[in-house]
Amino acid sequence: MLYRLARTGFFQLDAEKAHDLAIKNFQRFNGTPLDLFYRQQLPNRPVECMGLTFRNPVGLAAGLDKNGECIEAFDAMGFGFVEVGTVTPRPQPGNDKPRLFRLVEAEGIINRMGFNNLGVDHLVENVKKAKYNCVLGINIGKNKDTPIENGAEDYLICMEKVYEYAGYIAVNISSPNTPGLRSLQYGEALDELLSELKAKQAELAEKHGKYVPLALKIAPDLSDDEISQICESLIKNNIDGVIATNTTLDRTVVEGMKHAHEAGGLSGRPVQSRSTEVVRKLHQELGDKLPIIGVGGVDSYVAAKEKMMAGAQLVQVYTGFIYHGPGLVRDIVKNL
């Protein structure tokens, strides 16, 4: 009820202004009596995945807390894991505004943010100060002005800086809002990137005395053959997990709706079915060789269960959280 009232107010604002205000309020309320608006005690539903123990299988997807400013607040909401980022080596402003749009009747969002963030060093400082009990994932990407042929270097820089502080590292090569980025999902480019990341992981594991798993985040806009090739690369390079999926460029199910024509990636309920199909295809290809984190339209217990039945061990929410609030996390965890 409280969130429904808050949402009514937030939805009167421009989508990005509402997002920024929510982040500021989470920072302001954290550790004060006002955090009772979102703090919740949830039952333990432990899951072993990628060598880590998650207190429950429901996580916050990357993109909501790009700079790691609200880890403690999201931890207080009961998430089993929180993924911050996407973060890049250098700060960058992202794409021109407006760049975030609600498709309310479809419970969807279109964004063309463009990896706006304050840089990896800023994020690391925030992570070092935060106190939390959930697993922390850090999602890494490349700067817009880094040529795609040099993209691996950006991922390696970020990986080196976040390794010591991450529970796992998510490698984002599937955002549609950085020109050329999705080309890293294919063929030799993917193999070379994963090989370099794996070598860096071994080097950092020895240096820090701990193994931090790597998960690759992929797009929903892939053919079955492309998914099969990605799976071959994941297995060949001993990657620890795969996150499926990012946002879609497809507008078929929202055609004619307000804002549906806007450029960018579409998330929420409109991508639910396709992302679940990608999870199912990944599971058919991978079996138990590596775990799948399912994300895309997880807006209810039923949607979460469908992802798990398709083969996901963990699920993440983002757009569903915008529309339904912390109660969504509670409903999924309690019904598992």
Swiss-Prot record:
Note on how the cofactor is bound: Binds 1 FMN per subunit.
EC code: 1.3.5.2
Record field: catalytic activity: (S)-dihydroorotate + a quinone = orotate + a quinol
A Pfam family: DHO_dh
TM region positions: none
Active site feature: 175
Binding site for FMN: 62-66, 86, 139, 172, 217, 245, 268, 297, 318-319
Cofactor(s) needed for function: FMN
Keywords noted in UniProt: Cell membrane, Flavoprotein, FMN, Membrane, Oxidoreductase, Pyrimidine biosynthesis
Keyword Cell membrane: yes
Annotated InterPro entries: Aldolase_TIM, DHO_dehydrogenase, Dihydroorotate_DH_1_2, Dihydroorotate_DH_2, Dihydroorotate_DH_cat, Dihydroorotate_DH_CS
Principal location class: membrane
UniProt similarity note: Belongs to the dihydroorotate dehydrogenase family. Type 2 subfamily.
PANTHER family documented for this protein: DIHYDROOROTATE DEHYDROGENASE (QUINONE), MITOCHONDRIAL, DIHYDROOROTATE DEHYDROGENASE (QUINONE), MITOCHONDRIAL-RELATED
Summary of subunit composition and partner proteins: Monomer.
Record function comment: Catalyzes the conversion of dihydroorotate to orotate with quinone as electron acceptor.
Name used for this protein in its record: Dihydroorotate dehydrogenase (quinone)
